[in-house]
Amino acid sequence: MIVKTRAVILREIKYRDQSKICSIYTREFGKMSIIIKGARNPKNRLSGLFSAGNVVDLVLYKKSSRDIQLATDGNLVLSPMVPEPDLERFAILYRIIDFVRHTTENDEKNLPLFTLLTGTLEQLYHTNVNFQQLYAWFLLRFVSLLGFQPSLRTCVFSGEELLPAIEALQLTELYFVMNPGGLALPKAAGSSLAKKQLIPVRLAMLLSALAATRLPAGDSIKADPREIEDLWNLLQEYCSLHLEHARGRKNLDIVSQILLK
């Protein structure tokens, strides 16, 4: 049957002389694979449309008996090349689409995840964007959508409200506990064997502020670059623990080196 959907291009592979096979994440069907015949022919109207990171409106000839569906038409909605190419933007882009590609299953519709992905890419493709801050926000929302939302307002062990306890005890550090995920008071976490990491209260408050932000624009969270780097390193470790498929891939190491320069 003929169907229309909006999709994010996650990966493109050359196929035969002039075609492409792409992994895409769609609004209606989740992740799927498509073939675009003649997509590498410069005379083809669809040439250039199916590049990683593009958001496109597609027309598909879809058959449930096929693993790879046929794309017959499409129009560009968003591109990382607009307003202009940026190395740091592409480094963040490939981290994001890599996470989605490796942690989702084919043919499982997830509209909240699609909305998160396209909303993040739309913001990423703007000018004057704090790329690292946006990436940290995406990691937190992404892992939360997949069922691993960390507890950031109350102690993950005792359930005690964190802000009053921080003020009363004049704390300078809290624990971030990897499993169960969330912040913990030192007195509650001290005897626990759970994997945990001491972090400054300032970093914990930045994490809470990030969680409360609908979609960061510019430098909406006031933090220096080192703090943002610490944030997304913490969240990367948290995601890697809970999303096994996101662990240890070479391309993540490469873009990490780019971002940390």
Swiss-Prot record:
Sorted alphabetically, the keyword list is: DNA damage, DNA recombination, DNA repair
The set of disulfide-linked cysteines is: none
Looking up SUPFAM superfamilies in the UniProt record yields: ArfGap/RecO-like zinc finger, Nucleic acid-binding proteins
What InterPro entries has UniProt attached to this entry?
A: ARFGAP/RecO (IPR037278), DNA_rep/recomb_RecO_N (IPR022572), NA-bd_OB-fold (IPR012340), RecO (IPR003717), RecO_C (IPR042242)
Record-linked Pfam families: RecO_C, RecO_N
Look up the record and give one Gene Ontology term from the biological process aspect.
Answer: double-strand break repair
Q: GO CC terms on record?
A: bacterial nucleoid
Function in brief = Involved in DNA repair and RecF pathway recombination.
Instruction: Tell me which family the UniProt entry assigns to this protein.
Output: Belongs to the RecO family.
- PANTHER family under this entry? DNA REPAIR PROTEIN RECO (PTHR33991:SF1)
Write the protein's name.
DNA repair protein RecO
Q: Which organism is it from?
A: Pelodictyon phaeoclathratiforme (strain DSM 5477 / BU-1)
GN (gene name): recO
